[in-house]
Amino acid sequence: MPAALHRRSWVPAASEDHVLAIAADAAARDAAGVAAEVERLVADSHRIHDVDGLNLNPATNVMNPAAEALLSRGLGSRPSLGYPGDKYEMGLEAIERIEVVAAELAAEVFGARFAEVRVSSGALSNLYVFMATCQPGDTIIAPPPAIGGHVTHHAAGAAGLYGLKTVPAPVDADGYSVDVVALAKLAREVKPKLITIGGSLNLFPHPVPAIREVADSVGAKVLFDAAHLSGMVAGKAWPQPLEDGAHAITMSTYKSLGGPAGGLIVSNDAALMERIDAIAYPGLTANSDAGRTAALARGLLDWKVHGTAYAAAMRDTAQALARALDALGLPVFAKARGFTQSHQFALEAARWGGGQRAAKQLARGGLLACGIGLPIAPVDGDINGLRLGVPEIVRLGFTPEDMPQLAGWIARALAGDAPAVAAEVRERRTRLNGLRYIVR
């Protein structure tokens, strides 16, 4: 039978050709064939990520197997509307306790008084805060893509879809953050309701106390987007945003935090969290995935017990890899500042034709990464940086002592020796044994 999906004129032609070919293949199979194909694809993904490759993408991680197992225990299809102790549906005595345990662990780990665990993604976490602090038509100030500002803070993402006007924050290129002096001037001019900080690449601590002073001067709130920094914050290897003045922290729970896919909001501001609570229920979340909440609770327990050691290991390993790449002559961004103080850093990617081209070359060598924007000269037709991170490989057992070898693989793969590198990476994976920094 022909595919039910039709061509979408607004999608790039090459992507849509690929989509329709997959759809046609699925439509041509009987039920058993589709089931077999899904199983094959799941196994293939496992091979790519867990057998043949090493993930240097800081936007991903591996979960504690005990947490991951909770995703398939039948909780996810049980709707859970309302407050614990007064649920709309019956039979939720256990699930409501799981919700409270997850929130309590989040509050403990992030030094917060309040936690919203029902959010299904980091992007929606941002939207909840936008809605709780702003009205459509209001102005916000957010980091631009040149310093890792995320699309959800801008016109094409949640902020724009909610009707907010985003003004890019002025850039401190050397610090890969915002220029606070220029920010104060801009805030006086545009009168934002919200100032956001944090993004898809974070190298050095952001000046949150100074940003809070700017926000207070114009009556704005401060949102710290810890989508990528969540593990560093949880492990106390990074300044604590709530202590420094942020009104709320949003995050994804599956990146450096190493939990299930989803979002999380923490705050010490009761009035703000009251509004966010109403947005979550009965507003936009309604039924949440209780299986994800259980997995999140189990994952947060890892941070309560091992977080300090894990975050420090990520920082030390990222710094060691950056130094090793620099020693091989690769252009590591922010060399004058010591490359990074977090779990991630970037290469200037012009010599390889851009960050995405470089990432594709690395992937041929079994090393998975992606491009990122940097406040340097642009690259025609591509992103000008290549983002690298270590959360997953540290959890797999890699240490700073392993980084010269990994740097050599990266350099060789980028120089065209990807097939040989892929074989060496695959062999190294066979010698990995279990995960570190987890509660078993």
Curated annotation (Swiss-Prot):
E.C. number(s) listed in UniProt: 4.1.2.-
Sorted UniProt keywords: Lyase, Pyridoxal phosphate
GO BP term, pick one: tetrahydrofolate interconversion
Sections of the chain in a coiled coil: none
Co-factor requirement: pyridoxal 5'-phosphate
InterPro entries assigned: PyrdxlP-dep_Trfase, PyrdxlP-dep_Trfase_major, PyrdxlP-dep_Trfase_small, Ser_HO-MeTrfase, Ser_HO-MeTrfase-like, SHMT-like_dom
Domain of life: Bacteria
Gene Ontology MF terms in the entry: glycine hydroxymethyltransferase activity; lyase activity; pyridoxal phosphate binding
Quaternary structure note: Homodimer.
Function: Catalyzes the reversible interconversion of alpha-methyl-L-serine to L-alanine and formaldehyde. Can also catalyze the synthesis of alpha-ethyl-L-serine from L-2-aminobutyric acid and formaldehyde. Also shows low alanine racemase activity. Cannot use alpha-methyl-D-serine, L-serine, D-serine, (S)-2-amino-1-propanol, (R)-2-amino-1-propanol, (S)-alpha-hydroxymethyltyrosine, (R)-alpha-hydroxymethyltyrosine, alpha-iso-butyl-DL-serine, alpha-iso-propyl-DL-serine or alpha-benzyl-DL-serine. Cannot use D-alanine instead of L-alanine as the substrate for alpha-methyl-L-serine synthesis.
Name of this chain's protein: Alpha-methylserine aldolase
